[in-house]
Amino acid sequence: MMKRVALFKENDFNDLHMSRLLVHDSPYFKILNFNFRAGQELPIHSHEIEGQLSIVVLEGEGEFLGKEGATIPAGPGDTLISDISEPHGIRARSDLRVLVTIAPPI
């Protein structure tokens, strides 16, 4: 099976909160697209399960967020890879589009 998703057409921005699009969900992995307006964020959180995630910045500028107030600059092409049990989040400094992959899916 092959599937094409035009992320920029399927998921727009929302002035009130981040927007979320489930791109793909299977027994093997999940892909999500999050769009943030400047100043919006996905608060730091973690999942008490085994697995890994990646967050790829497609467009815009922001910060990857971690435990104890850690911040890592995030721009186009930057990728965060982490165990899913590690605290993680993201904050937008400009309009920001990210693609998140989770394996196995939660």
Give short role names for the model-derived ranges.
Residues 1-32, 43:
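A short, N-terminal "cap"/entry segment at the start of jelly-roll beta-barrel domains
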Residues 41-43, 80, 84-89:
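Histidine-centered metal-chelating micro-motifs
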Residues 58-59, 75-76, 94:
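A cytosolic small-molecule/anion-sensing beta-strand core signal
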Residues 50-63, 67:
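Glycine- and acidic-residue-biased ligand/ion/polar-headgroup-sensing regions
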